[in-house]
């Protein structure tokens, strides 16, 4: 006969192992995004009348580099139509959702990392200034940090 205390200890050990596995798995998911990412393309659909679609690929006038760090900070810098820009902020992931907050400007998007490519899907609701948009951005990992 197995003593009840041994059952409790075994059950507790199993629960601790499952908890540890869950924590490590969550950290592993976040680590997919850690690294340096270079902009490749953006395709946007503008729900105007008529609907418009535009695509832009990386060139000397359209560049961006995102750097995600393990401590939850990120930075970006780039060039858009000859104008340089840069900022820093905080990032977090929850399942397939990436949240970036740079100076109070929050971007929430779906993300997927497949090999050395990261895809960000951004949905923006219509406002007084802008039409509703759906954008897909692709970035390539510059330095594999996994």
Language model features: what each stretch is:
Residues 1-31:
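Bacterial Sec-dependent N-terminal signal peptides
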Residues 24-88, 92-146:
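Lipid interaction determinants
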């Amino acid at each position: 006969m197995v003593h009840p205390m041994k059952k409790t200890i075994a059950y507790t050990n199993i629960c601790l192992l499952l908890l540890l596995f869950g924590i490590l798995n969550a950290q592993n998911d976040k680590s997919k995004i850690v690294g340096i990412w270079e902009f490749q393309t953006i395709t946007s659909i503008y729900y105007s009348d008529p609907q418009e679609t535009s695509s832009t690929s990386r060139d000397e006038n359209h560049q961006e580099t995102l750097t995600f760090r393990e401590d939850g900070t990120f930075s970006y810098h780039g060039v858009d139509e000859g104008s340089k820009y840069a900022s820093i902020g905080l990032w977090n992931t929850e399942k397939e959702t990436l949240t970036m907050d740079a100076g109070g400007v929050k971007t929430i998007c779906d993300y997927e990392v497949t090999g050395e490519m990261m895809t960000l899907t951004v949905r923006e609701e219509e406002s007084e200034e802008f039409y509703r948009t759906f954008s897909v951005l692709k970035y390539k990992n510059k330095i594999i940090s996994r």
